[in-house]
Amino acid sequence: QMDVQSTNVALLDTISREEIVAEITGVADKYQEMQVQHAHVRFHEHKEKLRGTPLIQCQIRLRTNRGQLAGSGEGYGADHAFHVALDKLERNVLELKGINADEEYRGQLLRKLGEL
């Protein structure tokens, strides 16, 4: 199981630690060559509220063998904030995967051109 550190767990209202670990693992698995060494999920409550639900900021940071990746987002309730941050993190993971694939393709193309 992945090592996930959560800060301000008192703000977790409708989402559990197990769900957080499962969701982050799902995002990390989209890029097999990336091994996650550590994940940190941080929640911060703002004073603003909507119908009694506080505005929460969530930051997710992954330390991997490919460098650091992060995603952050705000939402009313920990669940909403976490999923906004998770979407941004997922986009960053897929972008990193695409950049590495482009570099690999470029190297293959240059080798082919060198052989001609």
Model-based region annotation:
Residues Q1-Q57, R61-L116:
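Polyanion-binding surfaces on beta-sheet-dominated domains and ring/shell assemblies
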